[in-house]
C-alpha cells in the first residue's frame, strides 16, 4: 500500500493536516470478518449504531454513518486498520495486537484491550517432521505474513529466518517445500490439523485493541477522549454483567 504523501516526508499526517478535518465527523476504522461480528455487542453498549449494512458481509459499501452524527465508520481489511489510523485516514480504530506487533507504528496509541478476537501467533511444522527443524540451526526458511514478528522471534534464538512472504494458504508451504515451518495466526488449530501441521511454539497471545492516531488525539482531544471512555464504559458494563 502506497502511503499518502501528506504533511511529512514519510506520508504521516501532521497536526495541520488533521486540523483540516476538525469540523468533520471522526472516522472509526473497523475490521471486516469475524472481529466485526464479535465487536457488534461492544458497539451496541457504547451507543454507536452503524448503518445496518455495515455488519452485512455482502455489503459493498466501505463507509457508513452511525447514530452519532459526529462519527462515521469505515470497514477495511483487518491488516489495514492500523495503516489507516497511523496515516490519518481514520482517527480511531480496532485491530489485533498481531498487527500492532508487526508494524509497530509510532503514531498509534492503544489505550484499551477490548478482549475480543482471542487467538495466538504460533510456529507450526508438519506432523511428520520428527525433530524441530530449528534445533541446532543458524538459518531457517519460514513462511508467514508476519515477517517482522518471525524474524524477531527466531533472532531471539540466534536463528536467521529466511522469509517466504505469503498472505494466505500458509499451511501449504511446508508440504510444497517452500518453507520448513510457518508462523501464522491460530484460533482453534483446526486448519493446521486438517493440513497435517502441528503447533510447536506460541509466540504471542492476541486480542483486539482500540487504537488512536496520536496527532488526532492532540488536535481533537475532547471528542476522542470521550469516545475512548465510551468504549471503556462498555467493557466495564460487560465485566459487571
UniProtKB/Swiss-Prot annotation:
Gene3D superfamilies: Periplasmic binding protein-like II (3.40.190.10). It is an enzyme of class 2 (transferase). It comes from the Bacteria. It is found in: Cytoplasm. GO terms for molecular function: ATP binding; ATP phosphoribosyltransferase activity. Keywords: Amino-acid biosynthesis, ATP-binding, Cytoplasm, Glycosyltransferase, Histidine biosynthesis, Nucleotide-binding, Transferase. Coiled coil: none annotated. It holds the Pfam family HisG. Its EC number is 2.4.2.17. Lacks the C-terminal regulatory region which is replaced by HisZ. Catalyzes the condensation of ATP and 5-phosphoribose 1-diphosphate to form N'-(5'-phosphoribosyl)-ATP (PR-ATP). Has a crucial role in the pathway because the rate of histidine biosynthesis seems to be controlled primarily by regulation of HisG enzymatic activity. HAMAP family: HisG_Short. Heteromultimer composed of HisG and HisZ subunits. This is ATP phosphoribosyltransferase. The lineage of its organism: Bacteria, Pseudomonadati, Pseudomonadota, Alphaproteobacteria, Acetobacterales.
Amino acid at each position: 500500500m502506497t502511503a499518502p504523501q501528506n504533511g511529512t516526508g514519510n506520508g504521516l499526517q501532521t497536526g495541520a493536516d488533521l486540523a483540516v478535518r476538525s469540523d468533520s465527523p471522526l472516522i472509526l476504522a473497523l475490521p471486516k470478518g469475524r472481529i466485526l461480528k464479535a465487536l457488534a455487542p461492544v458497539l451496541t453498549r457504547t451507543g454507536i449504531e452503524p448503518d445496518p449494512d455495515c455488519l452485512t458481509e455482502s455489503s459493498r459499501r466501505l463507509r457508513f454513518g452511525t447514530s452519532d452524527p459526529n462519527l462515521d465508520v469505515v470497514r477495511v481489511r483487518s491488516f489495514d486498520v492500523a495503516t489507516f489510523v497511523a496515516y490519518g485516514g481514520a482517527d480511531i480504530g480496532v485491530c489485533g495486537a498481531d498487527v500492532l506487533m508487526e508494524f509497530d507504528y509510532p503514531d498509534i496509541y492503544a489505550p484499551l484491550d477490548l478482549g475480543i478476537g482471542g487467538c495466538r501467533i504460533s510456529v507450526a511444522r508438519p506432523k511428520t517432521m520428527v525433530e524441530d527443524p530449528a534445533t541446532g540451526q543458524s538459518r531457517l526458511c519460514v513462511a508467514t505474513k508476519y515477517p517482522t514478528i518471525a524474524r524477531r522471534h527466531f533472532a531471539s534464538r540466534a536463528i536467521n529466518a529466511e522469509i517466504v512472504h505469503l498472505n494466505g494458504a500458509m499451511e501449504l508451504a511446508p508440504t510444497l517445500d517452500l518453507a520448513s515451518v510457518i508462523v501464522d495466526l491460530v484460533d482453534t488449530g483446526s486448519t493446521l490439523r486438517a493440513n497435517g501441521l502441528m503447533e510447536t511454539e506460541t509466540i504471542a497471545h492476541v486480542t483486539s485493541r482500540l487504537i488512536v492516531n496520536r496527532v488526532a488525539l492532540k488536535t481533537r482531544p475532547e471528542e476522542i477522549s470521550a469516545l475512548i471512555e465510551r468504549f471503556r464504559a462498555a467493557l466495564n458494563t460487560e465485566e459487571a454483567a
